[in-house]
Design a protein with these regions (language model features):
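Oxidative protein folding and maturation machinery
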Residues: 1-161
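Short active-site neighborhood of thiol/selenol oxidoreductases, capturing the structured segment around
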Residues: 166
């Protein structure tokens, strides 16, 4: 409706796509978004739609690999544009990491999903030969990896009680 009021504008395009035209059909959920248009990363469109997609179509906790399948669907759409793909990878990685940090049950799935995104898409070949994640994304992913339980944390400095750096 707003797209009709403001045809051809960024505002109209983004607002008109905030909700899927096919909210209950997983393989059509993102069909109304033009993933080749990298301007979609400058709004809350993708984070909102990705989160709603996970909530609606991951079937978690009933399906052990529901989130993995959902990640793959999102990346199949996103990989048509390198910047959009990178935005989606980081958005999902950050979302799962932060969910894991606040999960009172300490469910290991959140860390496993971070590993899946890093191993399959950021450091792996999940996007094919056309998408090469930037050094910045690889560095951020490495920082996520270093913060996981069992990993060697990065070097850091703190002040002792005498205010000396240790």
């Amino acid at each position: 409706q707003l797209n009709n009021q403001y045809p051809g504008t960024y505002f109209g395009m983004i607002i008109s796509k905030m909700q899927s035209k096919n909210p209950l059909v997983s393989h059509l959920y993102f069909d109304d978004i033009d993933f080749t248009d990298q301007c979609i990363i400058r709004s809350s469109l993708l984070p909102n739609r990705i989160q709603t997609y996970f909530q609606t179509h991951s079937n978690w906790p009933n399906s052990k690999y529901g989130f993995h399948d959902a990640i793959d669907v999102i990346m199949d759409y996103a990989k048509v544009n390198e910047k959009v793909a990178e935005f989606c990878m980081y958005n999902m990685l950050d979302g799962f990491y932060n969910t894991g940090q606040t999960d009172k049950k300490n469910n290991p799935i959140w860390g496993e999903l971070c590993d899946y995104i890093m191993n399959e898409y950021i450091f792996g070949e999940g996007c094919g030969d056309d998408i090469e994640p930037s050094d910045l994304l690889k560095e951020r992913a490495s920082q996520f990896k270093n913060l996981q339980v069992g990993s060697v944390p990065p070097n850091f400095s703190i002040l002792d009680i005498q205010k000396s750096i240790i």
